[in-house]
Regions:
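Short, surface-exposed ligand-recognition loops at beta-strand->loop->(often short) alpha-helix junctions
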Residues: 10-16
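Short, small-residue-biased leader/transition segments that mark boundaries at the very start
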Residues: 4-5
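Cytosolic Rossmann-like ligand/nucleotide-binding regulatory domains
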Residues: 16-74
Length: 74
């Protein structure tokens, strides 16, 4: 992936809880792709725009590291 693009596990921001992937629209806003959701150590790669984000999940995302830092305030 090089130095520019990163695959990273991130915590879901509190303001996104109970919203759908389509509602947060990070692909359009930040050019970041959600690869999977992780809960209880298990990855769920079967996600759609209608998938709702839950409190105890994290995301596996792919994008430019600068975009990931900006989006998730890393």
């Amino acid at each position: 992936l090089g130095d520019v693009y990163k695959r990273q596990e991130v915590t879901i921001p509190p303001e996104w809880i109970d919203r759908t992937i389509g509602e947060i629209n990070i692909r359009k806003k930040y050019n970041i792709n959600i690869l999977a959701l992780k809960k209880d150590g298990k990855l769920d790669m079967n996600i759609t725009p209608d998938t709702q984000l839950c409190r105890d999940e994290s995301m596996l995302v792919l994008g430019k590291y600068a975009s990931i830092q900006k989006c998730f305030r890393l």
